[in-house]
A protein has these predicted regions:
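Binding-site signature for planar aromatic cofactors or substrates
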Residues: 6, 10, 16, 20-241
């Protein structure tokens, strides 16, 4: 028989610590990150994506989980000038231990899309969980809204080779795609990125949801899933006599 409802404050530390709290039938648990410190070796991309109501976090999850994107440019090819043209590009938004949300690409002006974007920098990219095992294990068709997609429309920018961002972007790409290190130097590959203007997510029934640029970059997936972050835990429990 339930005689009272208590509010218990406790602290839960990393995987090497233990919390002892006498409680039965936890009703609500709210977890908030306090420290923000990251132990990179312990960060793992969760197997299950965020809930549909966590739209910004879902966008970041898809981007960080993806190894490639579809990229749409405005064609400069003679017979289809002005038409949309789609190709596939390898992607990294940072090493596995550091999601930035910035889509970095390894591009060359010799490529059809690279030439298009040199003329008109407007671009749209799409990443989807259809490239992972998630949709397959859930038996979601790639077109099923629950097989989540993030669509980013923005400006294509060549990253300045003299900056630390260029080094970071290149390292991030090589970390995800080691074969890039051996691509022909004569093709003069370089690091580029997409600066978002509009961010859309389709992850459930009801249509596309818009995510503000601010919310997108504030939703840091790698901090949320870190196993060694110190947490404050507030639990509402039933106390049984």
């Amino acid at each position: 028989m339930v005689s009272a409802v208590g509010l218990v404050f406790g602290y839960q530390f990393g995987k090497n610590s233990t919390v002892r709290m006498a409680s039965i039938n936890i009703i609500v648990v709210i977890t908030l990150s306090l420290s923000g410190f990251i132990s990179g070796a312990d960060i793992i991309i969760p197997k299950s994506p965020p809930e549909p109501w966590q739209t910004a976090l879902m966008a970041r999850y898809i981007m960080h989980s993806s190894d490639w994107v579809s990229i749409a440019s405005i064609s400069t090819q003679k017979d289809i000038i002005g038409y949309p043209f789609v190709s596939l590009k390898s992607l990294s938004d940072g090493p596995k231990t550091n999601s930035t949300g910035i889509p970095y690409l390894y591009m060359t002006d010799m490529d059809v899309s690279g030439h298009d974007l040199e003329v008109d920098s407007r671009v749209t990219i799409m990443a989807t969980l259809a490239q992972s095992d998630y949709c397959r294990t859930q038996q979601y068709d790639p077109q099923d809204p629950r097989c989540a997609k993030v669509i980013i429309t923005g400006k294509y920018i060549k990253v300045d080779k003299k900056t630390s961002e260029y080094t970071f972007g290149q390292t991030s790409l090589f970390d995800r795609h080691p074969a890039m290190k051996t691509w022909p130097t004569g093709h003069e590959f370089f690091v580029a990125k997409v600066d978002p203007v509009q961010i859309d997510v389709l992850d459930y029934f009801g249509g596309i949801k818009h995510v503000s640029k601010e919310d997108y970059f504030n939703a840091n997936i790698t901090v949320i899933i870190n196993a060694d972050v110190e947490f404050a835990r507030v639990s509402v429990i039933e106390i049984i006599n």
